Amino acid sequence: MASPRAFTALMSLALLVAGCQGAEAESFTRLPVPKPPAVQGQQPVLWVSLAAHLGPQPLLLEGASAPLQLRDAQGERVSGRRLSLRWVQQPLPEPLEIRRSVLGPFASFEAAEQAALAWNALGVAAEVAHPREWEVWAPADLAGPKGYPVRQVQQRLTQRRVLQLNTASGWRSLQGPVQLQAPGGLRFNGGVFAGPFRLQADAYGSWTLVEQVPLERYLQGVVPHEIGAGSPPAALAAQAVLARTWALRNRHRFAVDGYHLCSDTQCQVYSDPRQAGSAVRQAVSRTTGQVLALNGEPIHAVYHASNGGVSADEDEAWPLPELRYLEPSLDWRSAPPPGLTLPLDHQEVAALLARQSGVVGAAHPLFRWRRQLDQASLRKGLGARAASLGSPLKPVVLERGPSGRVVRLAIEGPGGQVVLERDAIRRTYRQLPSTLFVLSPSGTGRWSVVGGGFGHGAGLSQAGAIDLAARGWSVEQILSRYYPGAQLVPIQALPAEDHRGAL
């Protein structure tokens, strides 16, 4: 174990000792925080980040209609309608060495989690972190699992970031975590949130504003932002079930930072629940406590805006093990036309993209789309990786999945190639709404990209759900179409929290 002084330094950060590498090195894998509480019971509560990576920029918190009530870890209490906070650097009693092995960055949590599981299978205590990008962390000086390059990171910490509150007598240091009550709501990011709240340190030395929000209230802040408040009732209800299921399945997503979920597109977009209209509230109420499950576990309830006429399987989006409820299928109102059978090759994808009539969800604005790639955009997407390739660059589709989506795309040059896989394709070239596309030359150093759909394509197509609901389909029929074999069950039927969830 580390020396008493090093241990005291960690405790002064309100963190638990973890990743200790021995007395001589006195190094740690990371600055750990306590895990969030279990998400369980008939009325589970989620810890959701409203703002992450806080500091050193100041933070102003404002009560919507009543004073805020603040209490820090030492019992200091302050009340005020507006609370002005800042972070300052203070020296540690003794420097701390942070050393770790790192995989990534990854394009998504799903890809990072699979890498962590591969490392776990080798007996390595690996975990997913999100300092700015998705990474996997483990103790220092370890080899990565097969196929994953590993790098070593070392930091020497001599200061800590301390939270301070502006009072009538000057700036007062606060000991985290800080509890915050908002009897009249907290005005934040254009909305009003009921709370309660916490300000707490994360694994990176910055801070997070967390709302402790009951699951059903959380859904009121998610559903309208994910599918649109004006969607038909059955589509709203389907979205409520999926958002509830997704939240439970992903409750471990930010465990390294001491909370469950974020509130942006890395999770589900969550905003002011008070702005939910009656249709959204009815959809949440109508499905209260209902989740999609298989074998007693919440499914991987992924969804997206538009599948372009064909659903993807899980392996076309992320390197996940086979999930039998996520399977490729042509999303037609009746039988698909002759000549379109799975798996789709290049010609069949082109034929699919030439069609719109008879396809479910064809009203979405990105159901069909066109983009251009040129030398500048190819190089910009790759960033530093393009330097060794030389000029000119050329995109080449190496492999398609069963639905015809591109799962391996090479950017080739005289000096070699960079191969992008699955979700890394759209992360690298964000102008592409999906990976359901065909490439064709459109001049020297230019390519036309004709595609369909918006998003990864796995699971429910929101445009499809809206279309089907408008045609009289029930919520049960919609969910059964996009997740065959999964069952609607009450939350009480799920097993106790295990902080990981089931694939």
Identify the role of each PLM range.
Residues 2-503:
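Conserved, single-site charged/polar hotspot
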